[in-house]
């Protein structure tokens, strides 16, 4: 009986690690002085770090949001209540959908988007929240569809 119980426990552990990632077993850390809020699936849909500024709670540090089915949908960081650093989005199936970068709540730097099949859909840069420089788009088959150039959010070619 103990042998069966041990084997059953190991099987559940292996399936959890291999298939679901054991969200309840993951650890999440916040910057010093911040408090971890929310719950991951199956009991919740998001976790975030929070601190108080001027008597008001604001997000600061880790932020993760999951779909209704438990797949990770959004992952990023906040700094003093504003998006900061790298933000990733995922399709319901778990494949990456996009990576964007933020500074002080404003999109800044490289954007990369993917189709659900893994092919890159778009690549470009943001400057002060506006498209800037060369932007390229590809079809789901990997063939580039177009290329445009932006300056300060305006298409120039």
What are the residue ranges of the model-derived segments?
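Bacterial N-terminal signal peptides that target proteins for export
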Residues: 1-10
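Glycine/tyrosine- and acidic-biased, solvent-exposed loop/turn segments at the edges of beta-strands
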Residues: 15-157
């Amino acid at each position: 009986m103990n042998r069966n119980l041990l084997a059953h426990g190991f099987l559940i552990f292996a399936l959890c690690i291999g298939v679901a990632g054991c969200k309840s077993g993951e650890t999440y850390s916040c910057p010093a002085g911040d408090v971890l809020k929310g719950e991951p699936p199956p009991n919740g849909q998001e976790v975030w770090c929070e601190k108080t500024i001027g008597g008001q709670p604001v997000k600061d540090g880790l932020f993760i949001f999951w779909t209704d089915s438990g797949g990770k949908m959004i992952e990023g960081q906040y700094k003093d209540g504003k998006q900061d650093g790298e933000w990733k989005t995922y399709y319901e199936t778990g494949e990456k959908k996009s990576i964007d970068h933020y500074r002080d709540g404003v999109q800044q730097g490289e954007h990369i988007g993917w189709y659900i099949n893994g092919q890159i859909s778009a690549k470009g840069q943001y400057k002060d929240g506006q498209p800037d420089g060369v932007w390229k788009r590809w079809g789901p088959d990997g063939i580039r569809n177009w290329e445009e150039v932006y300056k300060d959010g305006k298409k120039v070619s």
